[in-house]
Regions:
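Structural motif
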Residues: 72, 95, 130-131
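NAD(P)-binding Rossmann-fold cofactor-contacting core
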Residues: 94-108
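Glycine-rich adenosine-cofactor-binding loop
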Residues: 66-87
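Phosphate-bearing ligand-interacting subdomains
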Residues: 112-169
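A short, well-structured juxtamembrane/interface segment
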Residues: 50-69
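Substrate-recognition/cap helix-loop segment adjacent to the acidic, metal-dependent catalytic center
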Residues: 84-96
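Conserved S-adenosyl-L-methionine
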Residues: 1-11
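Flexible, glycine-/basic-rich loop-and-beta segments that form/coincide
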Residues: 11-51
Length: 169
């Protein structure tokens, strides 16, 4: 029997489940089970679809406006979740930076965006204004720290898109 569930931040959100032959369930586990039961209701997915479409529209609009202001759009992290985002939004990224040599010198599926090493950060001019889109959104802080360590342009921007679109400096 499920007697506890612990929410963790791994991969956006994961759970550790505690099982026991006893059957006394804490209130937060009962609440979690009640919340999970909503996954059987199509209305849950209709609301979710509207939320996702809103994030997409805001992200595309934000990136388009920054591109009009002369910003270069560069992705970081060729994670599967990022490829899903790109194929849904069709963001016109110049390239995607990834630290994994097995992904470098390849192209993103569907969008055919070149995947390059982080050495390309050294080739950017000091005058280049860049909007970085961390495609592995759950590693936003780590990706941002890597970029800032190599490049410190006060005009650069970083865009979060989950759970909402937010531009950071």
């Amino acid at each position: 029997n499920l007697i506890d569930a612990i929410k963790t931040p791994i991969h956006g959100t994961s759970y550790v489940f505690v099982l026991s032959p006893s059957y006394k369930r804490p209130k937060h586990v009962k609440n979690l089970i009640a919340m999970e039961s909503k996954l059987q209701d199509p209305v849950t997915y209709e609301h979710w679809a509207l939320e996702v479409a809103g994030i997409k529209d805001t992200l595309v609009h934000t990136c388009t406006e920054y591109k009009k202001l002369g910003y270069r759009l560069i992705g970081y992290g060729a994670a599967a979740k990022g490829m899903t985002l790109l194929n849904y939004t069709h963001l016109p990224l110049e390239y995607i930076i990834d630290d994994n040599p097995l992904k470098q010198k390849k192209y993103s599926p569907g969008m055919n965006i070149p995947i390059v090493s982080s050495d390309c950060l050294d080739t950017l001019k000091d005058t280049d204004k860049v909007m970085f889109i961390p495609l592995a959104w759950n590693f936003f802080k780590e990706i941002r720290a890597k970029i800032v360590e190599k490049r410190s342009n006060p005009d650069d921007r970083f865009v979060r898109y989950f759970p909402e679109v937010r531009v950071e400096y």
